[in-house]
């Protein structure tokens, strides 16, 4: 009986340790395996309720907002959600209220080397805010991860404010 308890506690300890390692804070570079500072442009769209139209944008490297976004995303730490292990990125719904917003950012790169020796270009990292839920897509593995950040609501609002500002 005592041996069974030790085995069960050991299994529980390993599971807790694995969860802590999986959800540890990471930079976007650690998640996407590419240095976001090498990004050449940022494109995407945004929308604020009650508007039904999306506003698209393209920010070149010369645009101050592009460098603001790159710096903001490079400095932020992200925690992968355990829900990623249970459910692939399935659809979700949300009934928007006045003032709710969503955005989608594509970080576009020129030819970029990955740690495994391969090279790629184009949209290598994509970040999406769906009414408060942050999703990060990485091209190197083709996965979309739900992530959280510290002070997430303020972070998501700041990104929206930058991309929705008039040039």
Predicted regions and their residues:
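Function-determining sites in protein domains
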Residues: 3-167
